[in-house]
């Protein structure tokens, strides 16, 4: 998430961010398939999640710094440039921009070298923590907090970044009894999301 990266760069010395993969489509669509269905094993399912998650894990195979750079550029490719990050050519372009070893990256993509790690992390998130969506944040062993953020002018304010971090950390560490907070606008976001995935749910 961009705001976490901004916080790290702004001098939050105690902030360490560890990213772990979670396959949202597995959480959303597993109940519509046969028991034991795993999206990362179903090569015929038109997944929007698996290709970029596997690519990010292939970047991680080249070290943490490579992963962090690739992950940030991948996020920007999707949310700022609105590129199709299921396309292997786009994923390769991002790897090139991140300065990765392209030969190794391409081979890892071809052999799906990161699929086992993605599967293990996803199933661990569900089994241990009941994760259902992304992004979900943990702070110092506190309760998991699922967050939806709207892009806007607030992202230009370092104070807003700090305020958001403080509030989410408080909910995670000190207020685990808060189970859900919603604004009316979130219903519209849910409706748009449902329309996006409707073709896969029929």
Residue spans of the language-model regions?
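Structural alpha/beta surface segment adjacent to cysteine/selenocysteine redox centers
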Residues: 1-90, 167-171, 175, 179-182, ...
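C-terminal cap of thioredoxin/glutaredoxin-like
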Residues: 4-9, 81, 85-202
